[in-house]
């Protein structure tokens, strides 16, 4: 079969290594100095590794999309220079060490980030009690061992006939999957010995179930993934068995784990199986729905998926080396420049910035120091604008960036005199500092730079293009290691800000950062929050409001100010031990991972700001519309823009094609519900409805879910509002009513992080396979083919390139063991080979049609006598 497919490919003469234009195979030769590995203390140089590297336009490697345990070898932007072919292997490319440029934003993982973290403590009754940090993985393993003991007790009790066959099937398939993930031969045989009686029982008593089980085993080394994906389990079969047969009390940490992750057995799965299941759970044919618990209670648990995933990770390795562009290429500030301000050329005042016209139809902006603002803030904005202008092409930044002109001191009296005639003069006076001499930052920018993204004068087409630019640049720069933590002033509350741990700042993934929160909270004065948003029609603005990504991963001023409790681990469920005077908690392990949590929170925060901005635009444009279908059309299109923005973020961060990412997101969040919920809650229309009509409307926007409950009195013409003037998203001390947005945010960040972790497992297994094939690890033929089959299970769903790479290893294994039986694996790899052949043939014909079209266009421009058209009869 494989020989025939190869002949087909050879006949068409197509390079098999490039069926997917967004991905490329790379064999790297790192000839640099020794690089510290991300998962051990070992040092290595001159490392050659096969890998699959998603690329940016132009061929530069995206470091964060490479497998985390391989990224130490791919912190570079490379140009392909040499090709080489391995026998029976994929076509590969060598990276030239002379042209590589280092990224500082590594996405590998390390043992820790910051040795200066404050000690883990829990404050009880004003007393700081030390917290004993108990790793997540240790507790998970303990519960799996208890489960295996319970299985043994079940078998010895001879009560299999009292358990539904579907549950026995779940146990059997999990044991087979667990055994296949086990590297210790003795433990593997012990697990298989537990599975054998279950299989014997099903084969004799439930032949139809046994047939289904065998079909799943033929398809995958981890058959439990596909069983759970296609069969909705109505209980946690592992915990149910533990409760039935484990009579000893669980430890406090085991109980905490069970309480937190009781909704699905997948939360107890080993890392390779969990990450593979998580990726497959987004597939269109998946019956898994994370919106509600299986008990159909009102609590969402999609955040639990993300939490369980993150607790399995190691801190992301992020450094800001001194030789990086960000450190060494910020230009000097021009303090000698002076701009001659004139009231005749003053266009308007925007916030604390004076805008002046120019003959070239651009705008010169004079940004004035605001109250309490240090001079360094304006300096940072100058430097960042200068840096991004210099590296705009390298970074692929699409925004129309401002051109910094100078920064210097001006008399406050001069500024007031020039601006006195403006309509916004009084507000301007309250914003600027009280000093006699004020620092100003002067820059030139296009007029669109001063048009906020929610400006109602834009049509939907222009808005969509502007949103795309902003989303692209936010995530491209996040990849580069530049974070914008103040895109908007989003607050959960303005009451008692200083006394709160979060200072009132809104947390987009609050369920992960605060154990007492189960859903997103109310957003205070949501339109006010994005009134001066740093997203403009031209792209990103106010570039000084940025931080290096290292600020998220260390106990920086930023993290200590807004996330102080996260750094100590003291906000988790804690168990006090009076005998020792200490406390312990399963979740204090988060303290070491706080940067990983804040990283995903930043992604969600960016997208939340996009949604609020779209909502502000929608309210302004449709508020006076009387045509209901036309009004709905606007909000429906805005919902499409939001979903597309999330898909674009996934594409930039992982390399997954945007169209596929959008399809996957729609499996987790309902775009129709999202459109109805945003239209309902982000306009004041609902404030005019009577109680019965309001309830009926909620049946529509929350179909299949409980309605949104609030006790606040609606303010006429506003809606839910604490201050009675500005609309809030949610009632006081209540959750956010935008439930589909919450699902969308979690679906996005989970897909991003889940893909990275799946890649980590894929490349870890790939190294194992290479060592087996090279003879470095001695094993038999069956173990070799089993290892290659496991690699196929860890390939990204829908990523044909990774699967084709695994196919090449399978062919190498068959060459290494030519007489070994492979019937158990051939059917899986024949599917990969057929898909590969189909893609290659389709690509060939696409290229042929494209070349023919281009040739026809060229011929049409030539004189008739020079045309190459065949004139034969």
UniProtKB/Swiss-Prot annotation:
It is an enzyme of class 6 (ligase). Mg(2+) binds at residues 542, 545. It catalyses: L-glutamyl-[protein] + L-glutamate + ATP = gamma-L-glutamyl-L-glutamyl-[protein] + ADP + phosphate + H(+); (L-glutamyl)(n)-gamma-L-glutamyl-L-glutamyl-[protein] + L-glutamate + ATP = (L-glutamyl)(n+1)-gamma-L-glutamyl-L-glutamyl-[protein] + ADP + phosphate + H(+). One of its GO terms (molecular function) is metal ion binding. Its cofactor is Mg(2+). The keyword NAD applies. One of its GO terms (biological process) is proteolysis. Glytamylation catalyzed by SidJ requires host calmodulin and can be regulated by intracellular changes in Ca2+ concentrations. Also requires ATP. The keyword Transport does not apply. Keywords: Hydrolase, Ligase, Magnesium, Metal-binding, Multifunctional enzyme, NAD, Nucleotide-binding, Protease, Thiol protease, Transferase, Virulence. Residues 16-90, 851-873 are annotated as: Disordered. Residues 22-58 have a biased composition (Polar residues). Its EC number is 6.-.-.-. It comes from the Bacteria. Interacts with host calmodulin/CALM1; this interaction is required for glutamylase activity. Glutamylase that mediates the covalent attachment of glutamate moieties to SdeA on one of the catalytic residues that is required for its mono-ADP-ribosyltransferase activity. In turn, inhibits SdeA ubiquitinating activity. Also glutamylates related SdeB, SdeC and SidE. Glutamylase activity only occurs in the host since it requires host calmodulin. May also reverse the SdeA-mediated substrate ubiquitination by cleaving the phosphodiester bond that links phosphoribosylated ubiquitin to protein substrates via its deubiquitinase activity. This is Calmodulin-dependent glutamylase SidJ. The lineage of its organism: Bacteria, Pseudomonadati, Pseudomonadota, Gammaproteobacteria, Legionellales. The gene is sidJ.
């Amino acid at each position: 079969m494989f020989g025939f497919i190869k002949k087909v490919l050879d006949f068409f003469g197509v390079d098999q290594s490039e069926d997917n234009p967004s991905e490329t195979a790379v064999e790297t030769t790192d000839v640099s100095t020794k690089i510290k590995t991300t998962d051990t203390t070992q040092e290595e140089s001159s490392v050659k590794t096969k890998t699959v590297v998603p690329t940016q336009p132009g061929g530069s490697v995206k470091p964060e999309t490479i497998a985390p345990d391989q990224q130490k070898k791919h912190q570079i932007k490379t140009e392909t220079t040499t090709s080489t072919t391995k026998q029976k292997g994929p076509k590969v490319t060598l990276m030239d060490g002379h042209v590589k440029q280092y990224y500082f934003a590594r996405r590998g993982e390390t043992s820790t980030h910051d040795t200066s973290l404050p000690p883990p403590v829990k404050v009880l009754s004003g007393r700081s009690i030390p917290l004993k940090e108990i790793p997540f993985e240790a507790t998970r393993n303990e519960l799996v061992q208890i489960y295996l003991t319970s299985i043994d007790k079940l078998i010895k009790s001879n009560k299999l006939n009292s358990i539904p066959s579907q549950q026995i099937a779940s146990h059997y398939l999990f044991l087979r999957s667990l055994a296949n993930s086990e590297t210790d031969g003795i433990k593997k045989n012990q697990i298989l010995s537990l599975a054998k009686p279950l299989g014997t029982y099903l084969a004799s008593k439930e032949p139809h179930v046994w047939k289904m089980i065998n079909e799943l085993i033929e398809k995958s080394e981890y058959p439990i993934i596909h069983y759970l994906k296609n069969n909705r389990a109505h209980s946690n079969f592992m915990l149910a068995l533990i409760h039935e047969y484990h009579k000893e009390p669980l430890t406090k940490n085991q109980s905490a784990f069970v309480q937190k992750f009781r909704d699905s057995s997948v939360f107890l799965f080993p890392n390779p199986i969990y990450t593979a299941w998580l990726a497959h759970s987004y597939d269109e044919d998946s019956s898994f729905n994370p919106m509600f618990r299986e008990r159909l209670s009102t609590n969402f648990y999609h955040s639990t998926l993300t939490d369980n995933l993150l607790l399995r990770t190691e801190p992301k390795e992020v450094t800001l080396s001194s030789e990086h562009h960000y450190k060494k290429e910020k230009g000097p500030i021009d303090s000698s420049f002076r701009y001659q301000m004139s009231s005749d050329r003053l266009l308007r005042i925007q916030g604390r910035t004076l805008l002046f016209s120019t003959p070239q139809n651009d705008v010169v902006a004079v940004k004035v120091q605001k109250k309490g603002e240090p001079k360094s803030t304006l300096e940072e904005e100058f430097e960042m604008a200068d840096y991004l202008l210099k590296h705009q092409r390298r970074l692929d930044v699409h925004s129309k960036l401002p051109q910094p002109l100078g920064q210097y001191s001006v008399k406050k009296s001069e500024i007031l005199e020039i601006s006195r005639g403006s309509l916004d003069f009084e507000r301007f006076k309250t914003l600027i500092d009280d000093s006699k001499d004020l620092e100003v930052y002067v820059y030139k920018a296009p007029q669109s730079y001063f048009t906020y993204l929610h400006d109602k004068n834009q049509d939907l087409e222009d808005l969509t293009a502007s949103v795309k630019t902003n989303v692209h640049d936010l995530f491209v720069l996040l990849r580069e290691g530049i974070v914008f933590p103040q895109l908007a002033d989003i607050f959960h509350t303005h009451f008692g800000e200083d006394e709160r741990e979060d200072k009132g700042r809104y947390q987009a993934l609050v369920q992960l950062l605060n154990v007492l929160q189960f859903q997103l909270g109310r957003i205070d004065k949501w339109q006010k929050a994005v009134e001066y948003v740093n997203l403009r029609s031209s792209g990103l603005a106010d570039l000084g409001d940025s931080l290096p990504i290292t600020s998220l991963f260390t106990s920086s001023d930023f993290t200590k100010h807004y996330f102080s409790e996260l750094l100590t681990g003291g906000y988790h469920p804690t168990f006090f031990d009076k005998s020792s005077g200490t406390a312990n908690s399963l979740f204090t392990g988060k303290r070491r991972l706080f940067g990983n949590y804040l990283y995903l929170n930043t992604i969600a925060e960016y997208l939340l700001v996009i949604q609020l901005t779209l909502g502000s635009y929608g309210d302004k444009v449709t508020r006076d519309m009387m045509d209901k279908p036309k009004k709905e059309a606007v909000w429906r299109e805005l919902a499409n823009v939001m979903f597309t923005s999330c898909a674009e973020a996934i594409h930039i961060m992982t390399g997954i094609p945007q169209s596929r990412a959008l399809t996957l997101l729609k499996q987790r969040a309902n775009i129709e519900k999202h459109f109805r919920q945003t239209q309902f809650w982000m306009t004041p229309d609902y404030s005019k409805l009577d109680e019965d009509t309001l309830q009926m409307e909620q049946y529509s926007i929350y179909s299949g879910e409980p309605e949104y409950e609030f006790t606040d009195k609606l303010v006429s013409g506003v809606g839910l509002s604490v201050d009675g003037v500005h609309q809030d998203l949610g009632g006081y001390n209540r959750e956010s009513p935008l439930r589909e947005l919450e699902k969308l945010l979690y679906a996005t960040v989970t897909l991003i992080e889940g893909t990275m972790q799946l890649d980590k497992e894929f490349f870890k297994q790939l190294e194992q396979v290479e060592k087996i094939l090279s003879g470095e690890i001695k094993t038999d033929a069956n173990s070799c083919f089993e290892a290659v089959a496991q690699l196929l299970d860890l390939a990204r769903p829908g990523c044909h390139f990774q699967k084709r790479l695994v196919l090449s290893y399978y062919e190498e294994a068959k060459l290494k063991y030519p007489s070994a039986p492979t019937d158990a694996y051939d059917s899986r790899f024949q599917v990969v080979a057929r898909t590969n052949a189909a893609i290659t043939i389709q690509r060939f014909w696409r290229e042929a049609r494209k070349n023919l079209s281009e040739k026809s266009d060229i011929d049409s421009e030539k004189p008739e006598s020079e045309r190459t058209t065949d004139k034969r009869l």
